[in-house]
A protein has these predicted regions:
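Generic structural signal for secondary-structure transition and capping sites
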Residues: 43-47, 94, 213
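Rieske [2Fe-2S] iron-sulfur-binding domain
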Residues: 55-161, 165-175, 291
Length: 383
């Protein structure tokens, strides 16, 4: 691919000042050639959250995922370490592991197609009848590994083995999360819900990262969170936003007697496609992964982790609120935006920003757009 065909993309110049900037061109939200560039330049070079260490607590446990169209898996190895590989057999490209999660039936990772088997280092150990194949050397064949990093118990993988470590780039946000929940490494999955959304991943991210839409679109949410206390912070590869919640509201009721810290709702976003959400009144944390699957489709997974893997009454009510109210409200919003992005009457919009970083400030959306621009800078201006 030598160029991006849409003229509005080629002529775009990103303004680093959010007060005067315009959003990314509409075509970047549906142009298929542009999405191919994003797959290579963004998703195959950045960190993807694939779960928590306690999702694969025992030796031989695994989880599978996909970095857009690249199947991957993370495995708890026999030495207790966690490793990750491309989930593709080196023989004929069959997926090695086909379930979302499970446990290996033996010490080896065995392809269900022709029974090629690999050890926990990804080295080929068995290939039936290979002794009859001229010049075949098992020792030369191994699965392609991914880089792995564990942050607060959550497993991040990267297809770029030379990628910079993630933690130093998001440490201030991680430190803030630890002040709320210092023992996240011990948490266990309690609930998960998925939404397959007919919208581009950036569209889903834009909606997640601003609360300008909250008053008209999320009546219960603005009854829960005091919008006067809401603020937005951006830095590097992360952003943080949220506010203080009211104990009595129409979303869900908080326990009495909580401190201000315990009543803070917060969204901690890590580039490019994951956020961690704190719901006050609960010791739970939610991971919010909005993984791109195509130019105009996103697979959104909202997973709730708790200290014991169980839902107490408050956390169960939070799940009910997100699953039945807040989540569907946002899905409808972004799907309608996706339709509007195709209109010949729209090319790009303006950011609504407040120097005080209040609830209606779209600083975090501007931050997301800036990161997209940085990763594909040379493809703008007709490059």
């Amino acid at each position: 691919m030598s160029s991006v065909p849409d003229l509005s993309i080629r002529q775009f110049d990103f303004d680093e000042n959010p007060e005067t900037a315009s959003t990314l061109p509409a075509a970047t939200y549906f142009d298929r050639d542009w999405f191919e560039l994003e797959k290579r330049r963004i998703f195959r070079r950045n960190w993807r959250c694939v779960g928590h260490v306690n999702d694969i607590a025992d030796k031989g446990d695994y989880v599978t995922d996909a970095i857009v169209d690249q199947p991957v898996f993370a495995l708890r190895c026999r030495d207790g370490s966690i490793r990750a590989f491309h989930n593709v057999c080196k023989h004929r490209a069959h997926l090695l592991l086909t379930a979302p999660r499970g446990t290996l039936k033996s010490k080896l990772i065995t392809c269900p197609y022709h029974a090629w088997a690999y050890d926990n280092d990804g080295c080929l150990q068995a290939a039936p009848h290979c002794e009859s194949i001229r010049g075949f050397d098992k020792s030369e064949i191994r699965l392609d590994a991914l880089k792995v990093e564990i942050i607060l118990g959550f497993i991040f993988v990267n297809a770029d083995l030379d990628a910079a470590d993630l933690l130093p780039q998001v440490a201030p946000g991680v430190d803030r999360l630890v002040r709320h929940l210092p023992d996240l490494e011990t948490y266990r999955l309690a609930s998960s819900i998925t939404f397959d959304i007919a919208a581009n991943w950036k569209n889903v991210g834009d909606n997640l990262l601003e609360c300008y839409h909250c008053q008209p679109a999320h009546k219960a949410f603005v009854d829960l969170v005091d919008m006067d206390s809401y603020s937005v912070e951006v830095d590097g590869l992360w952003s943080w936003q949220g506010g203080i919640c009211r104990p009595e509201n129409t979303a869900y009721n908080l326990p009495a007697g909580l401190s201000e810290l315990e009543r803070e709702f917060a969204t901690f976003y890590i580039w490019p496609d994951v956020a961690f959400v704190l719901f006050p009144g609960s010791r739970a944390i939610a991971s919010f992964v909005f993984g791109a699957t195509a130019a105009e489709s996103t697979h959104q997974v909202f997973s709730v982790y708790t200290p014991d893997g169980e839902l107490d009454d408050v956390t169960r009510d939070i799940c009910r609120y997100f699953n039945d109210v807040l989540g569907p409200e946002d899905v409808a919003l972004v799907e309608n935006v996706q339709k509007g992005l195709h209109s010949m009457s729209y090319s790009r919009g303006r950011f609504f920003v407040d120097p005080e970083r209040s609830y209606y400030s779209e600083h975090a959306v501007h931050h997301l757009h800036g990161l997209v621009f940085d990763h594909l800078r040379d493809f703008f201006h007709g490059a």
